Amino acid sequence: MKKLVSSVLAASMVLSLAACGSSASTDTASSSEAASTSTAATTEAAGEGSGAYTGTPIKIGGIGPVTGGAAIYGTCVANSAQIAVDEINALGGDIQFELMTEDDVNDAETSVNAYNALMDDGMQILVGTVTTQPALSVVPLSYEDRVFTLTPSASGDDVISINDNDNVFQICFTDSNQGSRSAQYIDENFDSPKIAIIYKNDDQYSIGIRDNFKAEADSRGMDIVYEGTFTEASQTDFNVQLAGAQSAGADLLFLPIYYTPASVILTQANAMGYAPTFFGVDGMDGILTAENFDASLAEGVYLLTPFSADSEDEMTQNFVAEYQDRFGEIPNQFGADAYDAIYTLYQAIQAAGATADMSNEEICDALIEVMPTLAVTGLTSAGSEMTWDENGAVSKDPTAVIIENGTYVTP
């Protein structure tokens, strides 16, 4: 059954790529262990394809947190990327991948060390980093080394613009898109809400989304009645911020933050009897499985995300089934981004004619040239196509979902 699901999933993804790209010529510990192990591309799965491949694979490096507070993101990214790599290798074609992953514990300095380790191991393309803060330290290095970089989920606008780099592309929405589209959705679907914002003011991801949300909300004349901030050191007590939002009469609380502090906010809001509508973004994905959190408190939470594991389309259901079969868990949006990243690379490499014997600079330049010509239908494209501009920003349609009975539902 596992082989059948993998084959169907790979075939559906490859057919999607061909159709839209022809113009371009278990528990946390077990999942973390699986994710943090460097895995050769020429696995047993590759031998099950239409023709065994014995050449040199292209070495893809991955950097993200598989331990620490953000491990749910990095683990799912690494696992999902491995699924895509195994599927592509099982096709038995001329393009084969070897995936090597390093843990950065969501820390910039550790991420730099991870990058250097991957370079020592012969990395040719980087799929990373998973989060924005480490990316801002790693991207200048990949630009200097001319390593093509496709980040699944580092959404900061600066990730694709720092040092005027030309080698970095994103699968995820930029923070500016997440912020502005969230404000647009709220304005068009809620009846003149009084809005409070709580954001993390020592995290570029949170700051970027907040800034762009506020700019769009102000331009639309939306009513922001309160703003509260917190830091890494203070993300266990939100009583002051929640009391401020409640006193200001806020009936919608916008949370441009990751799920861990969001789960604390929902818990403490419930304890004080404060029940606004909560609205998050892609970092909220994972709240239903947050540790020491009563998931029933997430009932009615909205989030803007390009992926829902509960979607009924065949591609999503096959991916979710394969992930559950391997890892015993439901994949999140970050994992879907990583899966799409590997298949986007597959299409780009085909279009560019890149091969493993080319230098990093040759591969990088070839992929930079073809990326703006691609159109990819993936798990995170909401049934439409992902395209990229020359700056590396992706264009695709976001989807708002609401949590009902422990699942994501389109309102």
Enumerate the predicted regions with their spans.
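C-terminal motif of bacterial Sec signal peptides marking the signal peptidase cleavage site
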Residues: 16-19
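Extracytosolic ligand-binding ectodomains
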Residues: 28, 34-411
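Positively charged n-region of N-terminal signal peptides that target proteins for export
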Residues: 1-9
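Universal eukaryotic N-terminal targeting presequences
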Residues: 1, 27-29
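Bacterial signal peptide processing site
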Residues: 21-24
